[in-house]
Amino acid sequence: MELATEPIEGVLLVDKPQGRTSFSLIRSLVRLIGVKKIGHAGTLDPFATGVMVMLIGRKFTRLSDIMLFEDKEYSAVAHLGTTTDTYDCDGKIVGRSKKVPTMEEVLECTSYFQGEIQQVPPMFSAKKVQGKKLYEYARQGLSIERSFATVRVDLRLIKYEYPRLHFVVKCSKGTYIRSIAHELGNMLGCGAYLEELRRLRSGNFSIDQCIDGNHLDEPGFDVFPHLRDANGLILQPTPVL
């Protein structure tokens, strides 16, 4: 029995390496498989790692808008005592504090991030205001008024050893984890920025289902055994009877 030759399409789950942009991984996949119709279900900043849901072929790229609305889960590290303009480790340092919060203070502040909260998007973000992305204003040295957005979060403290505060958070679409780190710093009175971020889950897809993103730069790497359907099941080749 032979296997039918079909167009390459499906969901490819990739563990994005640190230092890579999401779009550089898409370009690597385009070069590897020769398919230009590739989308995703949510980008990650260059310093972040973890689950990237890559959608291959027209049938699956059409699912992008649906998958973007699904909940996500992250592990993160907030660095206390220092503030940056971008709220993360890639930004310019704009403040320092010598205050060392107590565990009691940390527990009280982290307990706030449960259920629905109001969050303001950071200036260094792709959120559009008056037709321009916020980071375009920020790069011009401008800070403009931004509207609050209601997001849903479930934050769990993992470990606190000053200056690092480790936590895991499940959240709804549109949640900025670096804004959570920044707000934690404000609440604790010492400032903070997001030092590490790893996406553990995106919708039904988890990190243990992902392939190493570095494989996409290996000539001849076979993606077929790793393609999944929209429910996360491995796709099986269609036999020719």
UniProtKB/Swiss-Prot annotation:
Q: Report the superkingdom from the record.
A: Bacteria
Annotated GO MF terms: RNA binding; tRNA pseudouridine(55) synthase activity
The record's listing under InterPro entries reads: PsdUridine_synth_cat_dom_sf (IPR020103), PsdUridine_synth_N (IPR002501), tRNA_psdUridine_synth_TruB (IPR014780), TruB_C (IPR032819)
Instruction: List the Pfam families hit by this protein, alphabetically.
Output: TruB_C_2, TruB_N
Annotated membrane-spanning segments are: none
The record places the active site at D45 (nucleophile)
- Catalytic activity annotated for this protein? uridine(55) in tRNA = pseudouridine(55) in tRNA
Q: Single Gene Ontology BP term?
A: tRNA pseudouridine synthesis
Isomerase recorded as keyword = yes
Query: Has the keyword Iron-sulfur been applied to this entry?
Result: no
Tell me which UniProt keywords the record has, alphabetically. Answer: Isomerase, tRNA processing
Its Enzyme Commission number? 5.4.99.25
**Stated family:** Belongs to the pseudouridine synthase TruB family. Type 1 subfamily.
HAMAP family documented for this protein: TruB_bact
Q: What does this protein do?
A: Responsible for synthesis of pseudouridine from uracil-55 in the psi GC loop of transfer RNAs.
- NCBIfam families the record matches: TruB
> Which PANTHER family does this UniProt record tie to the protein?
PSEUDOURIDYLATE SYNTHASE TRUB1 (PTHR13767:SF2), TRNA-PSEUDOURIDINE SYNTHASE (PTHR13767)
UniProt name for this protein: tRNA pseudouridine synthase B
Q: From which organism does this entry originate?
A: Chlamydia muridarum (strain MoPn / Nigg)
Organism ancestry = Bacteria, Pseudomonadati, Chlamydiota, Chlamydiia, Chlamydiales
Underlying gene:
truB
